[in-house]
Amino acid sequence: MIDWTSWMDYGFMKMALAAILIITPLFGLMGTMIVNKKMAYFSDALGHSALTGIAVGVVCGIPDTNISMVIFAVVFALLLNKIGSRSTVSTDTIISVFSSCSVAIGLAILSKGGNFSKYSSLLVGDVLSITKKEIGYLVIIFIVTILFWITCFNWLNAICIHRALAKSKRIPVQLMDYVFAILVALIVMLSIKWVGILIINALLILPAASSRNLSVNMREYHVFSIIFSVFSGVMGLILSYYTNVATGPMIVIIASVIYFVTYFFGRKWKE
């Protein structure tokens, strides 16, 4: 018989659980606005830019790659927003160009001399290797994000509903775009090592998309998204322990199952 509590005997599992309980609510919360603002490509591009952030850290001799990833991601996010707001080319095209270029540069630098193998774990992530220092980073970004959400949510929501009307109400639309992009960049970069570059975007999008299938108002939209995100994270961690598979992909599998269930039964729920 399977002992469903044996995983709690290990310190690294407790550390992983702490990280998941801190960051998954942010995935659920920020994901709602990412879906509303149709920024799925943007968050995906940020995830892929992590390789370049690490490469910059290697070239500059920065010992903590988290710092180089965060700095590069913030610059990358601001640059995308700036060019996207001024260019006549579609936003998706601009993001694709920047993302492809960023990944290529990162791969070129990291693969020089055949050393890329030691960075391959970033593709699928490894939450079990998270450190107390990295959890500290997550706690800081959690507090900052919650404070931002409490103070600026109404502005963000107004911008999503009608951008021109928000400007007429003297809401700092451009500033909100920049701050939101920076927060997404920080959350993505500080989570990338344990979630994985290939699937980080799924954890931002799937809980919010699932919630949208069920919710009938904004409160439900946020609550369901956070619940789905936390549930996927915790169950993914536990099941990955017993099935001996990577935690990141398992979390995404569970989140995907939730999405399909809510997609097919969401209409009945709303009725």
Where are these regions (language model features)?
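Loop-to-transmembrane alpha-helix initiation sites
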Residues: A16, T65-I71, D92-S96, E134, ...
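Small-residue-rich segments of transmembrane alpha-helices in multi-pass membrane proteins
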Residues: S49-V59, V97-I109, S129-I130, V173-A185, ...
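Transmembrane alpha-helical segments in multi-pass inner-membrane proteins
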Residues: W194, I200-P249
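Short loop segments and helix-boundary regions at transmembrane helix junctions
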Residues: T32-N115, S211-V223, S240-Y242, G266-K268
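Membrane-interface capping segments at transmembrane-helix boundaries
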Residues: N154-W155, F264-E271
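C-terminal binding/interaction regions
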Residues: D3-M8, S120, V124-L128, F228-V230, ...
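Transmembrane helix-bundle core of multi-pass membrane transporters
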Residues: D3-M15, I71, S87, T91, ...
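Membrane-helix/interface signature in polytopic inner-membrane proteins
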Residues: L147-F180
